[in-house]
Amino acid sequence: MTGAGWEVVVLGAGAAGLMAAIHAAERGRRTLLLEKNRKPGVKILMSGGTRCNITHACDNRGIVAAYGAPGKFLHSALAALSVQQTVAFFEADGVPTKVEETGKVFPVSNKALDVLDALLSRLQRSGATLALGEPATDVRKPGDSFEIVTPQRLIPCPRVILTTGGQSYPGA
């Protein structure tokens, strides 16, 4: 597909980027997911001590409250995808979950790789395209659209979703 054909470009193939690309593609958008690393979901594999705590078993108010006043920004995201919907998403893709005493939700297998594999399988089925080893070096907005600049190409698109995360481990 040529760069001009993308309706949505998602930057960053961690948990948020994979979910965003899946949902955009499943809603009929021609979606490109760009990841600077050669492998997607690296932090997923490390989360929860390599078990991947998927979410926390409480209502949205509990999650927002855990972040204090700054947590108010979470309301809209949590309204779009509840804890129950998150659990259902993974269980529908063959990742049964369990709730531990702490309220953390983990895959029954205790393997973060199962979570990543489910996301990558769903991404492939969604029709989204994953481009690995292609960092976005600039995002421009000339007029009503965007241009994503990578070392390999210039990608015009009307919508960009930034899910680049943060540096939670050395070399991120």
Give, region by region, the residue ranges found by the protein language model.
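Helix-loop-beta segment of a Rossmann-like dinucleotide-binding subdomain
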Residues: 69-77, 91-117, 145-147, 157-159, ...
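Glycine-rich FAD pyrophosphate-binding loop
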Residues: 9, 25-49
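Beta1/beta-strand and adjacent pyrophosphate-binding region of the FAD-binding site
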Residues: 2-16
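Small-residue (primarily alanine) positions within well-ordered alpha-helices
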Residues: 13-16, 20-25
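Predominantly flavin-linked oxidoreductase catalytic cores and closely associated redox partners
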Residues: 46, 113-114, 118-172
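Glycine-rich active-site loop/strand segments that organize a redox cofactor
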Residues: 51-99
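Fold-independent oxyanion-binding glycine-rich loops
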Residues: 13-14, 35-37, 48-49, 56-57, ...
